Amino acid sequence: MNHDSSSRIVSRVKEWIAGAAPGAKLPSTRQLVAEYQASPVTVQKALRTLTAQGLIESRPGVGTFVRAYRTARPSDYGWQTAALRAAQTARPLNSAAMRSATNDVIAFHSGYPDRELLPERLVRAALTRAARGDAALSRPPAQGLPELQTWFAQELSTSTPVGVTPPQPSDVVVLPGSQSGLSSIFRGLVGHGQPLLVESPSYWGALLAAGQAGVNVIPVPSGPDGPDPEELDRAFEESGARLFYAQPNFANPTGAQWSAERGEEVLRIVQRHGAFLVEDDWAHDFGITAQSVPLAAKDDSGHVVYIRSLTKSVSPSIRIAAVIARGPARERIMGAQAAESMYVSGLLQAAALDVVTQPGWQTHLRGLSHQLQSRRDLLVTSLREHVPQAHLSHLPKGGLNLWLRMPDGFDVDQLTKDCEAAGVLIAAGTEWFPAEPEGPYIRLNYAGPNPGGFPEGARIIGAAVQAQLGL
């Protein structure tokens, strides 16, 4: 019989079940065949559908019965409280930036670029080619595919000045995303209970990784030009820290880019204290009116541990990043990484390498820069018109975000709730601070979907701000 016959039987038996008691026995297959004038195959198909829907259950050798619904007994997990003890970190395990959004909201909260800004054609073609190659069925080297190691090393080498030894492919460790790399770096180079200096504000994922690694996070104030050198030097002196985590180019959330002079001063401080600088170049591919200039390119003495991700610029489904470290530090990181994930999917590595070595990749990046500038400027213009109370200290030259200070005493958590109720998602700035926030901030992503909705989104934010201020 056809599919319609099976569906008809399912519908009729459901009506019968609705009037039957739990545990009631259904007519036999032979009876159902006769009643519905269908073949045994069609009847069995209908019964399988009802079983999958949880309406009936079969007891071999006995028959088929209406399934009895059991009231679920509440589970008691109280014993785990004593077993787990205190949580290792009080930070939430997920950021507002990771929330999924429905199509009927205006989303400024996300930490990722919209699908329209991704090289979709290149990604699909790369995945197809990778699936046909050896990478689909073979285990890659623990440190990564040699060709991908070479690409990452060459990318950093292009910024290396004369007189500085460029990195070698052997200095590269490929990672399953930068988040995993940060965790390995903090565990391998800092260690549980030891001090770690971080910019404040700083990337929430780095703060989460630090908390999970059990390190003692010490904030260093940072502004549009980078961290305060005197405060950084003092933090090293007082804490005895041997590692400073920072984002010199288009920092998340502020969008700040260090000046060349500030970068050199920070590097001198790090070297003087015999410490490491972990340079997170997360926005390398998101330059708008300036390009990322890695500080690691100026260091060949192993003080700078450089990490770069392709996840946001290639595809969130291709979680590939790399860390470039020289000397014993690389081995420490490699050991910590191996304990977490023994190797990175060769299929994803091959696909990522395919994308970034295609001629269309550079063409895509040029177009991406123009699109980001257009979106950034549209959102800034809309905010100036509708939310004049939000102060933008500087216009980011790259990255994905605007970092806005609200008036003193403003409740940004309440603002996020009010905006969400009106169909706009924003991110409160509190989660980007390693300690108490220095003021009320919000972060808005201008790389999100539907830029045509930016003016309306800004209008809704402005209305919520005015309501809270009583204007």
Regions found by a protein language model. Give the residues of each.
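Short beta-strand
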Residues: 57-58, 391-397
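Conserved active-site segment immediately N-terminal to the catalytic lysine
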Residues: 291-311, 331-334, 442-443
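N-terminal basic, amphipathic alpha-helical segments
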Residues: 1-128, 338, 344, 356, ...
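Conserved core of the PLP fold type I
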Residues: 135-273, 285-298, 372
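AMP-binding (ANL) adenylation modules
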Residues: 431-436
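PLP-dependent aminotransferase class I/II
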Residues: 305-385, 393-394
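Hydrophobic residues in well-ordered beta-strands that form the structural core
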Residues: 198, 219, 279, 352, ...
